[in-house]
Amino acid sequence: MAFGLDTGVENVVRIKVIGVGGGGNNVVNRMVRSGTRGVDFVAVNTDKQALNVSSATYKIQIGEKLTHGQGAGSDPEVGRKSAEESRAQISKALEDTDMVFITAGMGGGTGTGGAPIVAEIAREQGILTVGVVTKPFGFEGRRRMQQAEKGIEELQGKVDSLVIIPNERLKHATDQKITFANAFEIADDVLRQAVQSISDLIRDTGFINLDFADVTAIMKNAGMAHMGVGRAAGKGKA
């Protein structure tokens, strides 16, 4: 009896990564630049200028009537209403999708308010929905943290699995000195790693190969998930 590795996954599982708001859009741009394959990218924003420079294949300007393309002004309620206004566009972008990653930097307006609506629409369409979000750095202030926590609580009820990356802990997970100038760049890259590591497990054929049924069984209605960030250097690094 012969045993073989399943190489047909890439042609079957349709994965989309949707970046909502500034932080989410940054993750999408990083994944595109890193050459991530087999995934469709969608950028969702209230800020028209941010969408103009996005590397995503699909771009959705939400809340055009409400915000006139000028952003949500760090107000999650504006982000929520903008996503509600554009439900039809979001739903259209999610057609023919098996799994979606919704990524956002929580604490601002568009990502915090819009991500739960995007997740709600995805779940309504029967899509396996995974949220991957960051919590703010301490220096971003109490108000932003409170908004993030409220947004995360709302998002948790709309997704199958939710990965939360507390930016403040990145100080202990990187050799780089975190400064105000590079803090968000490092946070965006960790967010990218989180999304890419899960999608690669499904996409890549190797010694460990998860088929989509395995992933669905693990992540469907799983609630909170945890992610570790590791570093390796030198000969034989893993």
Can you annotate each of these PLM segments?
Residues 1-238:
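Tubulin/FtsZ superfamily GTPase core signature
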